Amino acid sequence: MKFSENWLRTFVNPPLSTRDLAHALTMAGLEVESVEPVAPAFHKVVVAEVLSVQKHPDADHLQVCKVKTGAAGNDEPLQIVCGAANVRAGIKVPCALSGAQLPGMAIKQTRIRGVESTGMLCSAKELGLEDASSGLLLLSPDAPVGTDFRAYYDLEDNLLTLKLTPNRGDCLGLSGIAREVAAITSQNRQSVEIKPVSAQIAETLAIHVDAATACPLYCGRVVRGISLDVATPQWMVQRLERSGLRAINPVVDVTNYVMLETGQPLHAFDLARIQGGLAGSIHIRFARPGESIELLNGENLVLQPDMLVIADDAKPLALAGIMGGNESGVTSGAVDLFLESAFFSPGVIAGKSFSLGFSSDSAYRFERGVDFGATRAAMERATDLILNICGGRVGPVTELRGSLPARDPIRLGLERVGRVLGVELDEGRVAELLHRLQFGFLNTDAVFYVTPPTYRFDLAIEEDLIEELARMYGYNRIAATMPRAKLDILSAPETRRTRSRLRQILVARDYQEVINYAFVETSWETELAGNRTPIALKNPLSNQLAVMRSSLLGGLISNLQFNLNRKQSRIRLFEIGGCFQKDGQTYSQQEKLAGLCYGDVVEEQWGLPARPVDFYDAKADIEALLWPGELRVAAARHPALHPGKSAEISIDGRIGGFLGELHPRWQQKLGLARSVVLFELNVDVLLARTLPQASEISKYPPIRRDIAVLVPKDVSVQAILDSMRSEKLSIISEIALFDVYQGKGVESDKKSLAFRMLLQDTEKTLTDAQADQVVAKLISVLENRFGARLRS
């Protein structure tokens, strides 16, 4: 919110410098982002009138002007050479006199192409008021000649820009900011006197509110016989421009001015462009299928059923609370108006502007909530200004009122105030602070019942009121103390892991966490994730971030390239984040954990030989995440992974994700010199934790037996391990694979698998015969199920 300091001081004028005023606002929670002067320093510039213009005798693009400046009581015209295209007799412009100091230049009497010039007629750019200008700055015909230009143009002013939080929509108007300044500084606020404008004609336009929940308050009135041949007053144009708005025409300028002054957006329709004119009607309703509208910004919009519109009997005229339509806007030929002031429910407007890809001042205010208690007053204020500037006659106000937001009293206890703030405020002090805030209240027995004003949508609970007291009391006056609130520390369930624990494990195993956008390239989704129906964004940040991700792998690969381009050779990354799927018209979100490994297993060192990371290193990292859960892998295909080096992961019997090396096609496409190992897991499955079971530690020595079996090449190790473990032989404490061999001495269709077994009893020392009997049983199982045989 940008505004003029001088305009603010017409409402409330505290005895504070600009700097102190900005500091006071910031300390009260209304951060002043910037303070800048309206104009740079310059002097000896006055309001002047061009009396005559003649061609320069020696330059086609120059004019020799006689200029009346009235400076220091001198009525003698000055001769000034000017090259501006818009110079002509009769205009009033700023004139820099000889000796004037302008931004970046000094003015002195000189000769230009042989003609004497004793000053300079100025453009807005030359005075530092604009970055660019096409000609002289033209002033109002009634500007008093000889007046110091800085005083006439009110340039002893500063522009303040507030960085408002979303809950403070009440400060999106000068009256709201003035209310805050008055409360902060304990000053009186001067309100604009708004008197109801009496109807001069009986004509009205029928209004039908078909969406009463979305529009619980709507005011409209007819204004006839206006003239747009007049100019918007200079003071209004200045205030608009200093708030970041340009002047368009008197009616539009008035509606914008009242919005800046009160925070209430208004809209004016050309009555002649409404279907049926006075015989027609206005409808506030939701859009119908197939309807469209061309907005004032030139955008053609196909309307959706959740969009609220202002319509006549034939078509939508405006996107309610956001922007008017081009077909019904007020242009230079308008004579009759229909003026609108309304309250639209914030939830109906919120997010619409963003989804459409543009913003508007109206939407910015309505989605935060405007003061429905001032809707009628804003209408009267705009009517009065239009009549004073454009003339005309007005009809009565038609007001349709439905169920407006309730203003239920909020309980505020002094004991709670002291406990939260750490400052003891007595009843009188709290009452004084609430009076400064203009909050209505009743109090009894150290308890206040405060009714939120109609302009404060952010007040709902006791803590909101305590925050208001803290702002008025002064955050800087509250001493630092230890919290006094009671804390109940809940015990974490042992059957659930935490996300922080998952992060700790991976960081301990040399991974670094990354956080990527949830938006990715379309090709990543269709090719890398195998998602043929990605969720497209209506308003993407860029073409490279056009769809929602269903997998985290694309972001990790992008991170890999980023690090490789910066000469990193050993990279381990992980991310925990949301992924999004579309199934028909249904959308779902799933949280996933993904990891990426590239380069050597360990940093280069003298004690260990270099070895590139592989499938089994990543598998070990996943097992560390899951301990003491049971991990199973089974060969499976994934579009991003190597068809012969990828697997599906099951966690305690539930499908949990996948693991494998990056597909050679992608490795070549990305120009990667080494293999990349990737995994992606379902976080919900990871968080479920199997409780460790206590078991007796045997005091008897274990017996180790190693066996090597020949099995068909297509038999997986996992299948063999599952078969041996399924026998549930109590004395077997461990079975592990320690060697795989194919080559000389082994048939081409076979492979040799060597397993280590530890056998141990908790009650006695095992004999060799007992151990051999158990091993023989397992060998028999493998022979029967897989055609395995012992390798001699």
UniProtKB/Swiss-Prot annotation:
Mg(2+) binds at residues 458, 464, 467-468. SMART domains: B3_4, B5, FDX-ACB. PANTHER family: PHENYLALANINE--TRNA LIGASE BETA SUBUNIT, PHENYLALANYL-TRNA SYNTHETASE BETA CHAIN AND LEUCINE-RICH REPEAT-CONTAINING PROTEIN 47. Residues 698-791 form the FDX-ACB domain. GO terms for cellular component: phenylalanine-tRNA ligase complex. This is Phenylalanine--tRNA ligase beta subunit. Its cofactor is Mg(2+). Residues 39-150 form the tRNA-binding domain. PROSITE patterns: B5, FDX_ACB, TRBD. InterPro entries: aa-tRNA-synth_II/BPL/LPL (IPR045864), B3/B4_tRNA-bd (IPR005146), DNA-bd_dom_put_sf (IPR009061), Fdx_antiC-bd (IPR005121), Fdx_antiC-bd_sf (IPR036690), NA-bd_OB-fold (IPR012340), Phe-tRNA-ligase_IIc_bsu (IPR045060), Phe-tRNA-ligase_IIc_bsu_bact (IPR004532). Binds 2 magnesium ions per tetramer. The keyword Nucleotide-binding applies. GO terms for biological process: phenylalanyl-tRNA aminoacylation. One of its GO terms (molecular function) is phenylalanine-tRNA ligase activity. Tetramer of two alpha and two beta subunits. SUPFAM superfamilies: Anticodon-binding domain of PheRS, Class II aaRS and biotin synthetases, Nucleic acid-binding proteins, PheT/TilS domain, Putative DNA-binding domain. Its main location: cytoplasm. It holds the Pfam family B5. It comes from the Bacteria. It is found in: Cytoplasm. It catalyses: tRNA(Phe) + L-phenylalanine + ATP = L-phenylalanyl-tRNA(Phe) + AMP + diphosphate + H(+). Belongs to the phenylalanyl-tRNA synthetase beta subunit family. Type 1 subfamily. Keywords: Aminoacyl-tRNA synthetase, ATP-binding, Cytoplasm, Ligase, Magnesium, Metal-binding, Nucleotide-binding, Protein biosynthesis, RNA-binding, tRNA-binding. Its EC number is 6.1.1.20.
